Each structure stands twice: as structure tokens, then as C-alpha cells.
């Protein structure tokens, strides 16, 4: 207070005021403060001071040929004196005015395209509605919010590659555009920006806004989606808020919202299945949101919500340290190990010094043509899920993983001495010795590995030592997945692990998330969510379960039929029949199942009693654990449309109606698909029987010579094409399959394609 009083006294004296306002500023400290460093200390003042000068702007000398020396009013537009310290010319602000009025004009067609985000923002604000202002205390929470509406979800690196490709296509530097979104955007933008005269750097900045999600940690009360965040300064102050309804939605907000709904539905469903973790993964892999695979969105989308994070944890999205082995990139996604030297003996009694990894670890293994997930313990492969383009690529990945596991049976499978050298003629380290050995010939390795019977997990099959697929046996711990094991990419801040009950833990073992944390809130998704997994059939109610079950049976009838006659138990255990059980009255499930299984057994025993329609109709009932009883049923009840409806064991009903004339099945009045006639019923033409192992390409093509008879087909080499005479004298072009795995579906496809080729 004393100081303030003293200052007031001083200021009241006119002499003090005069000194302060009139004296020149020549104190060294002050001069230093305003002149040291490149950073402008008082930009506003500097601007005012500069603009007060006659020629505050410098320009390239070429400007002298483009702008007259004086304007219409006779004012000088540029000075003949050079700018000190550069060879540029000094220019008056009036030159800018002249240029704007009289300078060259250019096409504006590219402006809305380049400045798309700004144009769209203006539209949203124009269409938006601002409501009343309320004065009240604002409770704000700092949240990480998306500040950039209308962006794609590319990572910074992906976006950088796209921008370089579009804006600076001739610059040197390796750029690999891998994702579908990258390629699509690049193509689109190249077309849009042809002959664009806007400065490339500006285009690059604007593209970045469109491609990358920008987040900030901001205090927010209320809406956090990007269309609200862009008007935060208009809608909430410290003590007031203004009601606002955005004038349009943007896809990135819709993706975030729909992702949360999908993740919640999936976690809720997985929690009640026998193996929650496997179920959750299967559902994430087979779900699409707005036409994009959910796993792809999870990988790129930083939304932090419990269910979403559980899904991410299940997919192994976390910080990873990657290394390369056998041409594959390994990223540890979980677990830890300590290294220890150990001496081991090969099958040839050669001693190898191995650095053994002790401990449980999980890895993603990513190569160009194959990918895998590996779970291993000390010198033991627990599980390997591989997917690849072809047999060869899958074999490569399996060899690499088996060697990496350091299992004893792998080391004992070595025949002969290991003495591989590198180009410099130096011996390779033991792990690479083993790798090279088995890459040359893995027969003994695969034979010695051991095989085991397998459960039927959707999307996965077994693989035998000779690399043929199987649905009943597989090399120990090894499975082949139809879906790629996706490359690991992550924005997560911590490493987490998840158990089969979907509990997510950090590295210290603290539980971070569990299904109990997942909100029960229901919402309507903005984008279409397509759940392909049978586990999600029930999300749209009992009718959907009924129709989906029968559609699945019809779609897979060729395989189902074979299993029905050869391995019914495996068929009854298919997860696709699980949802159906909830429709069958609990008390009747076991009795129905026992009855249907007995009926099926009689069909198998008594030749000629095979009835396709009846098998399809009753099959889902056989999936429940059967009760032995002598009960007979003429109809079976299912609970749909709020009451029990009957399916007649023999004959049609509103629930299950097969039209013999059209060969189409309707379930609850909805079309469930067509039944191709069955060879077992003696009615199918010779073509479907003959054309197994062949692909029908279309109508006859004279270039491939005269039509062969059906018997001459057997002489074709794999991949060879020929015309063939079928059925009633029609000729079609066929190709012998390169592999035999899909023979089952050939006869179905053949029948369809013959019809198309002939018509």
C-alpha cells in the first residue's frame, strides 16, 4: 500500500508526468529487451509503426515490370531504392490496392476445393441455430476433444505421405501408400486439384486439416463432438452459455458415435458367451461401421470410451517395441521375458548356445504376404494364428514362429549339421542357423511338431503337416485364420493386457477396465453398423435370429450336408446354432434335440429317406444337449413375435415354408434363400457332379479349341482352360482349379454359372 501511495503522489506532480512522457527511451536494458532475439516483442506496435512509413513492404524486383510506378492519382507505388540488406524493392501499401483492382485475375475454381474445411464450416454456421443466452455457473471439464470437423482418420505419417503424393509428386523420398483410404484420397485429390494455381504449401496445410484428427485438451461443458467444439468460444463462457444446434453433421463425429454403440453391443454380447475374449475378437473382426471394418476404425480412432478401449485392448492396441526375424516384423503386444543363455542339442547332436526368452509373451508377426499372432511361454509355442495369401506364405510364417518359439521338438528336428554363413562368410547366430535350416526344408519340423484335434472356431481352420487345411485336426497350437491378423498400430498411452473375461490390466497388474464398467446406455447409431457374426444376430430380435440361422444353413448347405452325414456332433456344436437356442422354450430344448437327433440317425440308416428340406428345418433344434426320451413331436415351438409359433415336423407352416416350385424358402414370410437341388435326391444334372474341381468362366470361347467331352476334362493341367460340352448339348468355358480346397462349393457355383453362361 505504501508503494502505491508513493506512486500516486509522484504521478500527481506534473514534472513526473512530463519526464515519463517526453524523455527518450535510451536505457540499455530496455533497448536490449526490444532488440534481442528474432521474436517480435510487440507485434501490434511494430505493425502500426511500419505501416506509417511510406514503403513498409518489400517485393521481388519483377514487381517493377508488373505494377506502374504511379497510380491514377499520381501516388508513387514503389521506390527505386533497394531494400537494405537484400536485392528486393521497397513497395507502398497503395501497390497492394492497385494490384487487387488491376492485377491479373486467376480461376477461382480450386478455392472451394482447397479451402473445403472453411467453406463447410461457414455452411454449418449459416445453417446452425443459435438459441438464447443463459447466465449460470459453468462446470467445465478438461477433455481431449476433436477440434477439426470433417477430417478423415489418417495418422500423421499416412497423411504426410498422401500430401507429398498429391502436392509434391516429383519430390524424392520413399512413400508407400498402403491403406485403402490413402489410395482413395490421393486419387480424389489429384483429380480435384489438377492445374491448381494456389501455393503448394497452402494446399499442403489445408490437406492436413482434412486428413488428420487434431485434438486439444480443452475445458468443455456440454457437447464434445467436433461441430460443437468449433464454436466453443460462442457457446460457453465462464458464467454464460448460448444454446446452439449445429447446421450439419460431419462423418468423423458419426464414426465416433457409432463406434461407441458397436463396441458396447459387442462387449455386452461377448460377456455372456463361453469364451468372452475369443467371441469379442470374432465380432470386432466381422463388424463394419459405415462400410468400414470396425477393426480398422479402432486402430485409427482415438475415442476413449470403456467399451471401445476393451475392444482395443483385446486387439492388442498398445505401445509396442518391434523387431525383425526371418523377414517378419515382430511386435510384442503383451507379456515380458528375461534372456538367459542355454546350451541345447540338435537332432544331429550338435551343441547350440541359445539366448532363451523366459516368460510369457504375445507377438504380432507381420510380413508382406502373411501375418500371425503368436503366444509363447519359455521355449514353448502356446498358440499361433496365421493368415496369408497362399500356402507358401503361410508355411513361411509358421516356420519363423516355430523357430522363434525355441521349442525342443524344433531343435530336435534338425537333421545334419548347421553351418550356414552370411555373405561375409561368417557363421550365423544359432537362431538364424535354425531358421535357414528349416526354410530350406521344413518337412521334419512339421512332422515332429505333433497334431491335435481342434474346436470349430468361426473364421479359423486347422493346418496339417503337409500344409493342407483341415477342420478336424491341426498342428499343435497352430491355426489358420481367414481374416488377416492386422498390423499393429496404436495411439494408446499404456501397455495393457486382457484376460479371457475381458479384464484389462496395466503392466503392474492393476485392473483398468472390465465389462462391468461398460455403460448400459442404448442409442441409435448414425452410421449403419453391420454385424456379420452369428453372435450378433439377436441384436435385432428373435425374428432376425430365426431368419439368419436358416440363411446360414442354406448358404453353407454343401458343407453342412457332408458334416450331417459324416460328423453330426461337430455340426451340432457349431456356434451359429447358439443364438437359436434362446428361441426354443427352455423345458423343451433337450427333448426336441433328442427327438431330432434320433430322426436324423434313422435318415442316415435307411437309404432313400434323406430329405433336404426337413434336415434344414430341424437342424437348429439338434444343437441343444439332447435328453434321451421316447417323446415324438409333430410340431416344434419357437418363441417369436411375442408368442410361441409352431414349426411342423412334416410340412409347411408360417414360420418355415418351402415352395417346391420355386425352390425358395420363406421364414416368417421373408425370403431366406434358394435350395439348389440335391444330387442325393437323384434329380441333379450330371454337370454339378462333373464340374467339381473346375471353375466355370462363362460362355464358349473358340480360342480354346473344340468342346471336350466330360471324360476328356481329367487330362487338363491345373489352371488350364477348355470348352466343355455339358448336359443338353450346351458348351461352356471352364478352368481346372489351381488348388483343391474349395471343391465343396464348386458344384453349387457351377450350377449357377452354367445357367448364366447358357442364358
Swiss-Prot record:
Belongs to the influenza viruses PB2 family. A motif (Nuclear localization signal) lies at residues 736-739. Plays an essential role in transcription initiation and cap-stealing mechanism, in which cellular capped pre-mRNAs are used to generate primers for viral transcription. Recognizes and binds the 7-methylguanosine-containing cap of the target pre-RNA which is subsequently cleaved after 10-13 nucleotides by the viral protein PA. Plays a role in the initiation of the viral genome replication and modulates the activity of the ribonucleoprotein (RNP) complex. One of its GO terms (biological process) is cap snatching. Its main location: virion. This is Polymerase basic protein 2. It comes from Influenza A virus (strain A/Chicken/Pennsylvania/1/1983 H5N2). Disulfide bonds: none annotated. GO terms for molecular function: RNA binding; RNA-directed RNA polymerase activity.
Amino acid at each position: 500500500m505504501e508503494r502505491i501511495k508513493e506512486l500516486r503522489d509522484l504521478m500527481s506532480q506534473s514534472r513526473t508526468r512530463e519526464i515519463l512522457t517526453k524523455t527518450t527511451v535510451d536505457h540499455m536494458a530496455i533497448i536490449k529487451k526490444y532488440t534481442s532475439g528474432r521474436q517480435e516483442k510487440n507485434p501490434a506496435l511494430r505493425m502500426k509503426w511500419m505501416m506509417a512509413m511510406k514503403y513498409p513492404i518489400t517485393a521481388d524486383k519483377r514487381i517493377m515490370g508488373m505494377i506502374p510506378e504511379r497510380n491514377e492519382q499520381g501516388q508513387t507505388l514503389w521506390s527505386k531504392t533497394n531494400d537494405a540488406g537484400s536485392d528486393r524493392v521497397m513497395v507502398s501499401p497503395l501497390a497492394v490496392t492497385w494490384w487487387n483492382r488491376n492485377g491479373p485475375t486467376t480461376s477461382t475454381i480450386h478455392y472451394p476445393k482447397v479451402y473445403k474445411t472453411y467453406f463447410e464450416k461457414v455452411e454449418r454456421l449459416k445453417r446452425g441455430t443459435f438459441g438464447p443466452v443463459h447466465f449460470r455457473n459453468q462446470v467445465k471439464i478438461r477433455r481431449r476433444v476433436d477440434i477439426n470437423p470433417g477430417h478423415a482418420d489418417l495418422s500423421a505419417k499416412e497423411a504426410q505421405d498422401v500430401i507429398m503424393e498429391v502436392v509434391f509428386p516429383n519430390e524424392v523420398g520413399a512413400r508407400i501408400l498402403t491403406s485403402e483410404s490413402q489410395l482413395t484420397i490421393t486419387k480424389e485429390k489429384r483429380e480435384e486439384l489438377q492445374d491448381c494455381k494456389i501455393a503448394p504449401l497452402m494446399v499442403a496445410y489445408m490437406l492436413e486439416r482434412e486428413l488428420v484428427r487434431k485434438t486439444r485438451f480443452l475445458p468443455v461443458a456440454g457437447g464434445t463432438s467436433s461441430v460443437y467444439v468449433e464454436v466453443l468460444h460462442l457457446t460457453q463462457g465462464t458464467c454464460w452459455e448460448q444454446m446452439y444446434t449445429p447446421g450439419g453433421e460431419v462423418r468423423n463425429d458419426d464414426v465416433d458415435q457409432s463406434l461407441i454403440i458397436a463396441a458396447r453391443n459387442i462387449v455386452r454380447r461377448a460377456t455372456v458367451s463361453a469364451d468372452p475374449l475369443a467371441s469379442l475378437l470374432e465380432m470386432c473382426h466381422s463388424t463394419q461401421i459405415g462400410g468400414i471394418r470396425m477393426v480398422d476404425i479402432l486402430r485409427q480412432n482415438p475415442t476413449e470410451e470403456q467399451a471401445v478401449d476393451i475392444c482395443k485392448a483385446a486387439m492388442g492396441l498398445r505401445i509396442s517395441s518391434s523387431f525383425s526375424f526371418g523377414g517378419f516384423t515382430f511386435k510384442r503386444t503383451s507379456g515380458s521375458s528375461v534372456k538367459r543363455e542355454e546350451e541345447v542339442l540338435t537332432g544331429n547332436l550338435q551343441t547350440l548356445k541359445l539366448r532363451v526368452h523366459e516368460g510369457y509373451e504375445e507377438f504380432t508377426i507381420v510380413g508382406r504376404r502373411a501375418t500371425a499372432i503368436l503366444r509363447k511361454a519359455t521355449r514353448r509355442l502356446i498358440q499361433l494364428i496365421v493368415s496369408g495369401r497362399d500356402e507358401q506364405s503361410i508355411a513361411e510364417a509358421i516356420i519363423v514362429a516355430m523357430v522363434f518359439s525355441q521349442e525342443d521338438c524344433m531343435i530336435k528336428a534338425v537333421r545334419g549339421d548347421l553351418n550356414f554363413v552370411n555373405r561375409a562368410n561368417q557363421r550365423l547366430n544359432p537362431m538364424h542357423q535354425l531358421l535357414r535350416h528349416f526354410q530350406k526344408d521344413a518337412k521334419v519340423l512339421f512332422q515332429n511338431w505333433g497334431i491335435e484335434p481342434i474346436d470349430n472356431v468361426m473364421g479359423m481352420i486347422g493346418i496339417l503337416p503337409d500344409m493342407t487345411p483341415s477342420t478336424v485336426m491341426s498342428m499343435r497350437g497352430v491355426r489358420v485364420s481367414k481374416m488377416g491378423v492386422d498390423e499393429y498400430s496404436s495411439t494408446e498411452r499404456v501397455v495393457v493386457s486382457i484376460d479371457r473375461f475381458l479384464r484389462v490390466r496395466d503392466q503392474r497388474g492393476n485392473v483398468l477396465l472390465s465389462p462391468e464398467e461398460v455403460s448400459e446406455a442404448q442409442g441409435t447409431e448414425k452410421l449403419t453398423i453391420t454385424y456379420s457374426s452369428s453372435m450378433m444376430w439377436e441384436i435385432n430380435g428373435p425374428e432376425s435370429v430365426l431368419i439368419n440361422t436358416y440363411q446360414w444353413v442354406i448358404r453353407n448347405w454343401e458343407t453342412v450336408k457332408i458334416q450331417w452325414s459324416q460328423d453330426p456332433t461337430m455340426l451340432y456344436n457349431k456356434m451359429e446354432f447358439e443364438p437359436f437356442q434362446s428361441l426354443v422354450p427352455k423345458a423343451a430344448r433337450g427333448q426336441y434335440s433328442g427327438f431330432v437327433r434320433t430322426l436324423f440317425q434313422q435318415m442316415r440308416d435307411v437309404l432313400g429317406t434323406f430329405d433336404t428340406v426337413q434336415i434344414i428345418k430341424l437342424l437348429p433344434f439338434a444343437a441343444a444337449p439332447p435328453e434321451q426320451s421316447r417323446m415324438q413331436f409333430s410340431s416344434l415351438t419357437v418363441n417369436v413375435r411375442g408368442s410361441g409359433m409352431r414349426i411342423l415336423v412334416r410340412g409347411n407352416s408360417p414360420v418355415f415354408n418351402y415352395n417346391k416350385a420355386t425352390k425358395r424358402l420363406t421364414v416368417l414370410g421373408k425370403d431366406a434363400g434358394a435350395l439348389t437341388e440335391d444330387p442325393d435326391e437323384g434329380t441333379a444334372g450330371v454337370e454339378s457332379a462333373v464340374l467339381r474341381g473346375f471353375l466355370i468362366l462363362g460362355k464358349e470361347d473358340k480360342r480354346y479349341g473344340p468342346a471336350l467331352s466330360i471324360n476328356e476334362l481329367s487330362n487338363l493341367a491345373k489352371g488350364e482352360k477348355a470348352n466343355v460340352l455339358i448336359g443338353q448339348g450346351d458348351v461352356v468355358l471352364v478352368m481346372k482349379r489351381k488348388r483343391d480346397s474349395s471343391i465343396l462349393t464348386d458344384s453349387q457355383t457351377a450350377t449357377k454359372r452354367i445357367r448364366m453362361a447358357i442364358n
